[in-house]
Curated annotation (Swiss-Prot):
Bias kind Acidic residues: ranges: 581-590
Membrane topology per record: Single-pass type I membrane protein
Underlying gene: kex1
Family according to the record: Belongs to the peptidase S10 family.
Natural source organism: Neosartorya fischeri (strain ATCC 1020 / DSM 3700 / CBS 544.65 / FGSC A1164 / JCM 1740 / NRRL 181 / WB 181)
Comp. bias intervals (Polar residues): 492-506
UniProt name for this protein: Pheromone-processing carboxypeptidase kex1
Catalytic activity: Preferential release of a C-terminal arginine or lysine residue
Function: Protease with a carboxypeptidase B-like function involved in the C-terminal processing of the lysine and arginine residues from protein precursors. Promotes cell fusion and is involved in the programmed cell death.
Gene Ontology cellular component terms for the protein in this record: membrane; trans-Golgi network
Length: 632
């Protein structure tokens, strides 16, 4: 907006009008800070993704949300909209472990819609979990992956983590209200077995505090934990038991006798501190197994998949092989820009943060296994699954925690005193895939020939498991279902396959989502317009009064601000049928309404020059790695 004063009546009038203009603009910005700094869903829209397959880009959003203003703590998310809708909207929140390992592992190597063919080419993942669920990947705690926080402001305890995650969800649903009514499932693996139950409990507590209709109760429908670090008291002693079962160590050998000494020390430490989540003396069992079973070429077992070998002392830290492509891809400047990474995130992406892992010791937190009975009894279904070739968070420990846990009037998988729920054989497309076991709201699935990262090895089978847990039945949708059977009995249809597809239910849901989006945009747009109109009115009044005083003065404004003005076009863009997020509007039209804040700019940060913590691949032996720690 430009004001000129071609009249020769003097500079006083020009100066006065300029002052009035600045005063009006200041008033406008004072009462409408959202025009300067607040973001909308459109700011998070991913308009392109380098290396994506040909064809329409999947609808996705990504970026940072502040969860700790005092320490500049921001969590990064990457969200994908589902490809099909069976009978209702569902959202799966995915978390990787560590603590301090990025959920981009899950996004690009496990359950996300894309996998990397090489370090610059994406291809579709036929087992992606986005078939019937929206996917929300979050790098957490602060400092993990693309998330960031001020130096030395990492968090330490599980309740701190869950509080920040609730803050994240509150703000995320404000940006994307169309998803707030979804059925919500929280899923993840490894050390996320500690995070997920705490987040679930925090959601329940948040829902219980709602006293009015201004807030929406979140529909938590279940939690899913794969190869989880849930009960250290059962998981630590399982290392040696698993090593015997898999033939890594021969029972009764001299090595076995030495390891049993470490086992005895560990068990005494557990007895002294039954609620400890990290016990260094117990970690020594795993380190000794890896060190003393290496061959003459210094090849040790891969702790995440004992079918594989790795160079000592890495012992699995170089796995999965996809990491060689994932890291350079996520450090590319064009990818960083496409994912709306804040310029405040100075260092490039790393899979795992040593600083976060070493700081998050949970010394004053109870192990999450103690939260599971109450969650089950409150009606939250829980699915625990394990790949049978994982050592570090092996299925033996998971089965022991189930056998010892009491909930809903029974112990373990008891169906009645002394009677246990049977194990059912599961086949997928004619191949033995694993076993299912269920009792009193808890489901356990053991996958055959699978590692610590089950969806990495068996993507379609893992999605079939998820769809059954979410009670998806696509019989009325169409498409080719998978042949999945329990004890030979064909199960409800859960897979249609292919990218992408459309259904009547999907179209209805899209219309509902679009309606909700426009309501949210209109609400924020109307508030902004009110302030703009007030400012323009005040400015116009002073111009009119100045003209009356100084008839020789003429205000020249090069563009009409009447009914065809930018303000009107802005309103039309907010309320019309166009897709705001997809970029159908001309963003330059907004330049006259707000000043771009620093978060509106995107810079490349894809280098390693200023890392927040140690690399995921340390030079030190694995003894520096926590069980369930520094891992996917």
């Amino acid at each position: 907006m430009l004001l000129t004063a071609p009249s020769s009546r003097g500079s006083r009038t020009q100066s006065g009008i300029a002052n009035v203009s600045w005063w009006a603009l200041s008033l406008l910005l004072l009462f409408s800070p959202t025009l300067v700094s607040a973001k909308s869903a459109a700011d998070y829209y991913v308009r392109s993704l380098p290396g994506a397959p040909e064809g329409p880009l999947l609808k996705m959003h990504a970026g940072h949300i502040e969860v700790d203003a005092q320490n500049n703590g921001n969590l990064f998310f990457w969200h994908y909209q589902n490809r099909h809708i069976a009978n209702r909207q569902r959202t799966v929140i995915w978390l990787n472990g560590g603590p301090g390992c990025s959920s981009m592992d899950g996004a690009l190597m496990e359950i996300g819609p894309y996998r990397l063919k090489d370090n610059h080419t994406l291809e579709y993942n036929n087992g992606s979990w986005d078939e019937f669920a929206n996917l929300l990947f979050v790098d957490q705690p602060v400092g993990t992956g693309f998330s960031y926080v001020s130096t030395n402001s990492y968090i330490h305890e599980l309740d701190e983590m869950s509080a920040q995650f609730i803050t994240f969800l509150e703000k995320w649903f404000q940006l994307f209200p169309e998803y707030e009514g979804d059925d919500i499932y929280i899923a993840g693996e490894s050390y996320a077995g500690q995070h997920i139950p705490y987040i679930a409990k925090a959601i329940q507590e948040r829902n219980n505090k709602i006293q009015n209709d201004q807030s929406v109760r979140w529909n938590l429908r279940g939690i899913v934990i794969g190869n989880g670090w849930i009960s250290p008291a059962q998981q630590y002693p399982s290392y040696l038991t698993f090593a015997y079962e898999e033939g890594l160590v021969t029972e009764g050998s001299s090595l076995a006798k030495d390891l049993e000494v470490y086992q005895s020390v560990c068990e005494s430490k557990i007895s002294a501190s039954p609620n400890a989540i990290n016990i260094r003396d117990c970690e020594e069992i795993l380190q000794q197994i890896l060190a003393r079973t290496k061959d003459t070429n210094r090849q040790c077992y891969n702790m995440y998949d004992v079918r594989l070998r790795d160079t000592y002392p890495s012992c699995g830290m170089n796995w999965p092989t996809d990491l060689v492509d994932v890291k350079p891809y996520l450090q590319r400047p064009d990818v960083v820009q496409a994912l709306n990474i804040n310029p405040e995130k100075k260092s490039g992406w790393e899979e795992c943060s040593g600083a976060v892992s070493s700081t998050f010791n949970a010394a004053n937190s109870l192990p999450s296994v103690q939260l599971l009975p109450e969650l089950l009894e409150s009606g939250i279904p829980i699915l625990l699954f394990s790949g049978d070739k994982d050592l570090i968070c092996n299925h033996v420990g998971t089965e022991q925690l189930i056998n010892n846990m009491k909930w809903n009037g029974g112990t373990g998988f008891e169906t009645s005193p002394g009677v246990w729920a049977p194990r059912h054989d599961w086949t997928f497309e004619g191949e033995p895939t694993g076993i299912y076991q269920y009792a009193r709201n808890l489901t356990y699935v053991l996958f055959y020939n699978a590692s610590h990262m089950v969806p990495y090895d068996l993507p379609r089978q893992s999605r079939d498991m998820l769809d059954r847990f979410m009670k998806v039945d696509i019989a009325n949708i169409g498409g080719k279902p998978a042949d999945s059977r329990i004890d030979g009995e064909k199960l409800p249809q859960t897979s249609v396959g292919g990218h992408p597809n459309s259904t009547a239910a999907e179209q209805q849901a899209k219309e509902k989502i679009k309606e909700t989006e426009w309501k949210a945009y209109a609400k924020s747009g109307e508030a902004a317009l009110i302030v703009v109109i007030i400012g323009v009115t005040v400015w116009g009044f002073f111009i009119w009064r100045s003209r009356r005083r100084n008839r020789g003065y003429q205000g020249v404004y090069q563009r009409d601000v009447g009914s065809g003005s930018i303000l009107e076009r802005f309103h039309n863009k907010r309320s019309g049928p166009a897709d705001v997020e997809a970029g159908d509007f001309d963003e330059s039209e907004l330049d006259n309404l707000h000043s771009p804040g620093p978060e509106q700019e995107h810079y490349a940060v894809g280098d390693d020059s200023d890392e927040e913590g140690p690399n995921h691949h340390p030079a030190a032996p694995p003894s520096s790695t926590k069980p369930g720690g520094a891992q996917p």
